[in-house]
Amino acid sequence: MAMGMFDKILGFIGFDETEEQQVDREREAVEKTETLQQIKRKNAQVVSIHSGRQLRVVVCDPASFDEAQNIADNLKNRRAVVVNLEKAGAEQARRIVDFISGATAALNGDMQKVGQNIFLFVPSNIDIANDTARETKEKSIFAWAKS
């Protein structure tokens, strides 16, 4: 109401707004509204990085071949599995590694020997980055130079 009264006084004196100025103000208001709507749309498409499922790593110490199926089930459920074969005998360990290697290959996964009798098996959604393979290869190549 006060603004309307002020506009009337300015109009009476001869300083009233022209129609162009009114149109410019309306246009600016519309542009601000459109910009806010575009920002809201962009924000609606943002996905939080932390909203995904947590990655789980399962550590297993199988003593017999009977436990190999549980390890394969973990891989099937897209979990990384670290297998420590120190409790298994040599023949059992070989059978377990063969079985889990086959399951890993069927699931397009990957495997890596981590240490003596310790293996890492991962499904296809996990990549293994390994710098130790190169170091191990270099150590074996230059083993003669150390003595």
From Swiss-Prot:
InterPro entries on file: Cell_div_SepF, Cell_div_SepF/SepF-rel, SepF-like_sf
Localization per Swiss-Prot or TrEMBL: Cytoplasm
Keyword Cytoplasm: yes
Entry keywords, A to Z: Cell cycle, Cell division, Cytoplasm, Septation
GO term, biological process aspect, one: FtsZ-dependent cytokinesis
Domain of life, source organism: Bacteria
Signal sequence interval, chain numbering: none
Disulphide bonds in the chain: none
Record GO cellular component, one term: cytoplasm
Protein's UniProt keywords contain ATP-binding: no
Subunit structure: Homodimer. Interacts with FtsZ.
Assigned protein family: Belongs to the SepF family.
PANTHER family from the UniProt entry: CELL DIVISION PROTEIN SEPF
Reported function: Cell division protein that is part of the divisome complex and is recruited early to the Z-ring. Probably stimulates Z-ring formation, perhaps through the cross-linking of FtsZ protofilaments. Its function overlaps with FtsA.
Protein name: Cell division protein SepF 1
Originating organism: Desulforamulus reducens (strain ATCC BAA-1160 / DSM 100696 / MI-1)
